[in-house]
């Protein structure tokens, strides 16, 4: 089983490294998506750079990456801790893809795919909460930030009604997913548009809004040419 786990973790990282947003932007617009819009290699920036239809495709693809690898782990009868390791590797691949010199996306939808396969109810919360309460105010990233804090608490305190059979492993898995998100946001290269932003504010903006400045519109277009 150890060999299977190691191989699936490696496979998860490689599958996660497939940069759908980058490939779509290259194919449809002939551009490097990292140099346009917000610069993020993800579905949201695909919407800005390429368009709605292809943004939907990238969303489905990125969710599918995470879900597929957990499904493979389930087929091998792995426990929750082992499945979480595979899922985390897939998200790390998306965030730091070997195929793009480790300059990837934020892993939001890949994380959603992983969470949904680990616990459908937690996946539902992770999807509904940001879009129900924050999308009307165009602050989905803030919703993602808060729901990622809520999920481990929910897994720990409400595991029985949610049908979570391995609450400790699930809770720890959710905490690690939160940490991966935080590390990804804080280690992203600083954008020139934020050169006058104090470090404390920069960290706050990244943790809460996943951007370097407070102005959302200016951020999503700061690399547009």
What feature does the model see in each segment?
Residues 21-24, 92-103, 129-137, 185-189:
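C-terminal ends of transmembrane helices
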Residues 23-53, 191-225:
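Cytosolic, membrane-interface loops and tails of multi-pass inner-membrane proteins
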Residues 124-126, 140-149, 163-178:
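Loop-to-transmembrane alpha-helix initiation sites
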Residues 1-8, 68-85, 116-123, 157-172:
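Helix-coil boundary and interhelical linker segments in multi-pass alpha-helical membrane proteins
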Residues 2-32, 184:
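N-terminal signal-anchor transmembrane alpha helix
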Residues 47-50, 73-76, 93, 108-139, ...:
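Interfacial segments of multi-pass membrane proteins
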Residues 31-42, 98-115, 139-150:
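Short, non-helical or kinked segments that cap or interrupt transmembrane helices
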Residues 48-73:
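Multi-pass membrane catalytic core of lipid/isoprenoid biosynthesis enzymes
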């Amino acid at each position: 089983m150890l060999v299977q786990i190691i191989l699936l973790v490696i496979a998860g990282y490689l599958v996660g490294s497939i940069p759908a947003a980058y490939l779509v932007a290259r194919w449809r617009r002939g551009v490097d998506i990292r140099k346009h819009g917000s610069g993020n290699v993800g579905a949201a920036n695909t919407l800005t750079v390429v368009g709605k239809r292809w943004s939907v495709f990238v969303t489905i693809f990125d969710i599918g990456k995470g879900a597929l690898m957990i499904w493979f782990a389930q087929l091998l009868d792995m426990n929750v801790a082992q499945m979480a390791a595979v899922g985390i590797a897939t998200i790390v691949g998306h965030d730091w893809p070997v195929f793009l010199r480790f300059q990837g996306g934020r892993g939001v939808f890949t994380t959603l795919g992983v969470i949904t396969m680990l616990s459908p109810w937690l996946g539902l919360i992770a999807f509904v909460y940001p879009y129900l309460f924050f999308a009307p105010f165009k602050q989905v990233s803030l919703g993602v930030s808060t729901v990622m804090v809520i999920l481990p608490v929910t897994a720990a305190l409400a595991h029985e009604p949610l049908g979570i059979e391995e609450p400790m492993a699930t809770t720890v898995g959710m905490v690690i997913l939160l940490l991966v998100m935080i590390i990804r946001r804080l280690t992203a290269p600083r954008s020139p548009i934020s050169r006058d932003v104090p470090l404390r504010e920069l960290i706050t903006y990244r943790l809460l809004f996943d951007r370097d400045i407070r102005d959302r519109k200016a951020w999503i277009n700061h690399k547009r040419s």
